[in-house]
Amino acid sequence: GWWTPVVTHELDYAIPADLWDSCRSEEPMPQGKTAFGVKFSADGGEVVICGAVIPKEGPARIEMIDRRPTGLGTQWLADFLNARYNTASCVVIDGRNGVDVLVEKITNKDTGAWKFKGSVIRPRATDMIAAVSLLMDELTEQSVTWYYKQEPLKDSAITSVKRPISGGWGFGGDNSTPIEACALALYGAKTSKRDPSRKMRIG
């Protein structure tokens, strides 16, 4: 009504829209060292998988691959990841619900493909802070790009807000899951010591 106080505080957006737009690209996904990031949303409602590729030359690329309600289970994710173990360096998986089940499905000695030690990463708070810091640095330096047709990813990026974590900050807000998954994927690609694409390039 008339007497409702005016809210004057502004949301502390994590990624300025102009910074995000400056890194858009119409180029196809490059070839190179690949990693996946999986984020289960804070409210437990959805899960998002993103990919990151670091080519030998040129900027890295982040892309959203899929997002689905957690009510559909995690078998589709496990199948996707198990099929790509031989081409990806690692997968970084974070969230409250569904993580344990997914990790079991991809590392189980009978059904899982992810055998290499350290190829499945469950980030701590310090890792999350580092992943966000890395993505922000890469955006600022324009050393990472996103595919221009990925409007849902753009929406997540430019509406995410700063969420305090353990002395640093991560992405928060109602739609931060996609950009969180991208940050995890890029962090995995940058920090993993495993790179199956190197073997593929020999000869």
Regions found by a protein language model. Name each.
Residues 2, 39-44, 53, 69, ...:
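Short, flexible loop/turn elements at secondary-structure junctions
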Residues 56-167:
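Mg2+-dependent endonuclease catalytic cores in nucleic-acid-processing enzymes, primarily RNase H-like
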Residues 12, 45, 69-77, 95, ...:
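Phosphate/oxyanion-binding active-site loops and adjacent basic polyanion-contact surfaces
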Residues 1-37:
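ATPase catalytic-site recognition across NTP-hydrolyzing enzymes
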Residues 162-203:
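Charge-patterned, long linear interaction tracts outside catalytic cores
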